[in-house]
Amino acid sequence: MSETSSHDSFYDSLSDVQEEGKSADFFPGLSAFLSQEEINKSLDLARRAIDSSETEDFDSEKEISQIFSKSPISLCETPSHEEPKSGKQTSSERPQDSRRAPVQPLTGDQAERITSPGSKRKPGVSPLLASPSYIRSLRKAEKRGAKNPNPSSKPKTAQQSKAGPQSQLCDKAASFIEELTSIFREAAKPRNRSPNGESSSPDSGYLSPKNQPSALMSASASQSPTADQLDQLEMDAEVKQAQGSLCYQAHQASEETLPLAHIPHPQPQKARHLPTAPRFIQKLRSQEVAEGSRVYLECRVTGNPTPRVRWFCEGKELYNSPDVQIHCESGELHTLVIAEAFEDDTGRYTCLATNPSGSDSTSAEVFIEGASSTDSDSESLSFISKAGAMPQAQKKTTSVSLTIGSSAPKTGVTTAVIQPLSVPVQQAHSATSYLCRPDGTTMGCLLPVFTKELQNTAASEGQVVVLECRVRGAPPLQVQWFRQGSEIQDSPDFRILQKKPRSTAEPEEICTLVIAESFPEDAGIFTCSATNDYGSVTSTAQLVITSANNENCSYDSTGEPNSDHFQHFPPPPPILETGSYELASQKPSEIQQVNSPNLGFSMAALQMQFNTAERETNGVHPSHGVNGLINGKAYGNKSPPTPTALLSPTKEPPPLLAKPKLDPLKLQQLQNQVRLEQEACAWPPAPPGVPCNSSSSGSSAPPSPPFPPPPPAFPELAACASPVPSEPMSALASRATAMQSSGSFNYARPKQFIAAQNLGPASGLPTPTSSPSSSSLPSPLSPTPRPFGRAPGPPFVEPEAMWGPSSPSPPPPPPPVFSPSAAYPVPDVFPLPPPPPPLPSSTSHCASPARFGPSQTPAAFLSALLPSQPPPVAVNALGLPKGVTPAGFPKKSSRTARIASDEEIQGTKDAVIQDLERKLRFKEDLLNNGQPRLTYEERMARRLLGADSANVFNIQEPEETAANQDAGAPRASVGGPLDGQKEYKVSSCEQRLISEIEYRLERSPVDESGDEVQDPDVPVENATAPFFEMKLKHYKIFEGMPVTFTCRVAGNPKPKIYWFKDGKQISPKSDHYTIQRDLDGTCSLHTTASTLDDDGNYTIMAANPQGRVSCTGRLMVQAVNQRGRSPRSPSGHPHARRPRSRSRDSGDENEPIQERFFRPHFLQAPGDLTVQEGKLCRMDCKVSGLPTPDLSWQLDGKPIRPDSAHKMLVRENGVHSLIIEPVTSRDAGIYTCIATNRAGQNSFNLELVVAAKEAHKAPVFMEKLQNTGVADGYPVRLECRVSGVPPPQIFWKKENESLTHSTERVSMHQDNHGYICLLIQGATKEDAGWYTVSAKNEAGIVSCTARLDVYTQWHQQPQTTKPKKVRPSASRYAALSDQGLDIKAAFQPEASPSHLTLNSGLVESEDL
């Protein structure tokens, strides 16, 4: 039941009466244990039951309305189309009401409220916040009415005369309410209970009993006008007309009875001097910021007297300090600023406001993302908006409150919540919300719930595949993975990762399955099962693997495993499937119905009472998802109304008829039919904003209300935003685009393990790997549980198959995707005319949207339109580097990249050229990445634009704040579209290095010489330490290209700026670098031609007396002529990449965390070597780089091949060796070692000199010793000459004694010419004997022996006796052998003394 009527003729709910005459104490009674949705249903059931007896009790209507009416002004008039009896009845009652009005005693405030036109149409927070007193008042309505002091006797008599029927009527209503109350009481008892008795979390979606009384009216004022539309979604016009008068009376009754009991209590809209409890009109917003960034929390609170405001972090009170600054402005705006946030600051921040009348609080999660954090960058986008930009969105309202079961303000879930107002609610209701209280204590919160389901994924063979889901539930959670029903065990091929919750306030686990290298046999249905003590849930997704030789990847066109999820369940849908994907297509009041009793576990008996008309017009069919849709098909012939009230609080859509059901078989037939129609269409481009009706149902949508269509750059998005056959869905998507800049769109995903999903966070389109059934993309573009599919045939495989040169105009390719705030400015930025009425749905080709079939989301269409490798072609889920834009997914660019809007040049040749140019830009990387041929479109564009015209857009990081972009702030990624400057994410290792550099720099002295002249130090008011409004990015460029680092710094006084490269300060007078600083604080460092030496970390440090702050950007300079690269690279072009390896590719830079490229760097390298021929030569080197470099060796420019003499080894410690054994003269020369990886190459040279092997010669006696005789006392010389190479060593021996050293009498001599001499001064008889000389070198040894005889001068030798000359035996020279002399060799015949061999009298003897 709606909170307000969609017709100004009668009250549709008690909320209208509550606004008019109910006092504050009335609210808490029933709302303490009933949610708003449950109360809605309660009232609706009661009305339906009462309606059944309306005919018999019709006569009592007049009586009751007379009794309970309060003010003619406060009552709605009967609509012109109401049934005559109702019209007559109410018209006849008005005069009586007017006469009775003054008689009823009312306080001035009540009268003011009742008659105030401003309060008349304010939607109530709850349609039926009934208390037991209200139930009693219904039962006692007759008595109370009779006792009311009323001077008019006529109405009194009439009332008494019809007391019987009226009593029956009241009893019925009271009975129904009591029955429903008892049902809901147990299911919702602790609802809105938190440790402090409140539930004012910004995204809880509920008002706590403590807050409700004072918050009601303001919340009503800010409530989305879509509450008015809920009536059309729940009831058709006939039901309302029949019930109008009855509701009128019931509301009068409530107004009559309740204020009597509660008049003394203060009213929400009383004059300011009356005390009011605190109420937060602007709540805190959860944030996720990078470490070191500034955290800014703000909220607004009202109350009388002015509330006392206190701040808490994780329950610990915070006080004003230099680190945490707490401010209060104008008594309402309270801010908490953390100048520099660290990981320790992560937690739940609560602002508590108290005064004597009560208290209120608001909480938000602040997550400080550390250097190695793996959470999403873009997650914080939804929280960034300027304070006060949309004050209405900050107020309490349940009309668009969607939570996933917990009061945690930020779950980190990747549920894209497109909200009509930028309410600070970043979560989406799952169907389990009815089980779950904000304090997370009930069974619904204990049960596991997937906050992000698995997404259908397609990948190429060899790519990394990552399947990720997020689950919350009471620990311990056991997560299991299955493929085709078989459990998957953790292994190197299938890594199962599970990230535990980062806080108890946010008990969400990230479960990831990583397939390191995918093969076609890995495809199939993957299931993740989460189990705890309270139950288990599963999430399923399909993985499609295409062969490596396929250029294009077709998604599963049926996706039955996912569509079956909804079709095989009984009416209460499973909690895991009624996910947040339902919500975006619903209006807020519809959203409330997601959690309404027809989904409740305790409402099985009552479910059948909600007829098809009501359930389906609510847009929620238990088995068919939201808006009666499956795969984009609508049930019925009536399109849902456009959310006009999103912008205009007074606009109300026409009633919505019930939608008939469609079975899956019929759906499939319709899908095939639409596909066939699409194949036959040429798809002429339509003006932007023309909604598309791709349904075959033959129905036309109602005219669109006047609110701005999406920006002109998104013709496809404007027209194709909804695969639903309804213009209003397109309008809702348009509305969502217009509202995103205020943070209402939250598509958060983890940094790691998301492959090629960049478009999702930027434009709200589901990504090719997403499955709507996973509830991770609850947007109008993915409202159904089936994955978008491709047609079985060729329709979405190659554009050539869809349109050719004969087509009137090629379909506009996807426009550049901007970050949310830039792409979807607030409505006043683009004051466009309202879109024209939708085309007849039967045409099925009004504008480009109809190009994708009913089972396709626009993202599928976009990915199909671009001929490419499989959409996740740049899959790099592990956060490892990527250098190619994901197929079909343009990189984000700034708005300035668009020269003329599509609207301005639609249908012209310029439009075609511009669109083709865009596509070429997005396809450039793919073309250079091994794609063998150009598509027709690209060939055409190159004819029109020239071959070198397509360039890659720079990447705008998601961290860029909406405020900066909307204000036209300088872009963080500098350089125009012609730059090849690409951003990328640094690894955690690099980040630690960067942090270390910054830490040291901020604590080290700097060179002030080249700094700009600063004003002398003067006292400064509001002095603030420097901080970066825009930080440096990390870039990857090619050698020779220009690069610019840009950031923006602020501080008071104006900070000084210093630049460093790898920790060394860069002089402002440097010739290589140009340093600039603008007046707005933008600082830049530019080099026109980068070299390999420019590779490194660039740090900017800003300093003023308040402190220092630094920021670092990594520059990777890649060599141009590395292996596999084309040496030619057109000017301004990103250089072609060499083909990637099978299992890893170097994908797009805007991935959450990419593979990092580090050029090889030699940590160890040998110098020049000289090696003797025949010896072993070993060259050792050590190299670093990422990926691990490949090493190759060259000799004089020629590759060295491994063979028996040349071996290449790698040791465990990473040392590479080239071993040559033995070395020959051919091995001499210049050796080059080349290390190569994807990031570039490096090399070193050395010279090897091979020393020739010497011609070794054994010693040879050229002159031998001679036998000598000498007279006693005379000197004697024993001489010989020996030669050998190398020169031999000489050893002397006398008999068996070695002569080791010279004495005064006996000395040994040797010269350089080989002459050897033994000189004996004054020979004696003892000197006589055999003397041996030996010569030895490496080649051998030789010896020579001679006899010395000493005789007296007077002794005459007898002539008769022949002297005996004895040759000693070899044994006499055993001592020589001991010295290593080869005695046998020494006594070869040629070595023997000639005089011995010639002497015939020579005899062998052992004795002398």
Swiss-Prot record:
One of its GO terms (cellular component) is lamellipodium. Gene3D superfamilies: Immunoglobulins. Residues 569-573, 830-834 are annotated as: Interaction with VASP. Detected in both muscle and non-muscle tissues and cells (at protein level). Isoform 3 is widely expressed, isoform 4 is particularly abundant in tissues rich in smooth muscle and in the cardiac muscle and isoform 1 is detected in heart. It comes from the Eukaryota. Residues 782-842 are annotated as: Interaction with EPS8. It is found in: Cytoplasm, Cytoskeleton; Cell junction, Focal adhesion; Cytoplasm, Myofibril, Sarcomere, Z line; Cell projection, Ruffle. Residues 807-842 are annotated as: Interaction with SORBS2, SPIN90, SRC and PFN1. Phosphorylated predominantly on serines and, to a lesser extent, on tyrosines. Phosphorylation at Ser-1143 by PKB/AKT1 modulates cytoskeletal organization and cell motility. SUPFAM superfamilies: Immunoglobulin. This is Palladin. It comes from Mus musculus (Mouse).
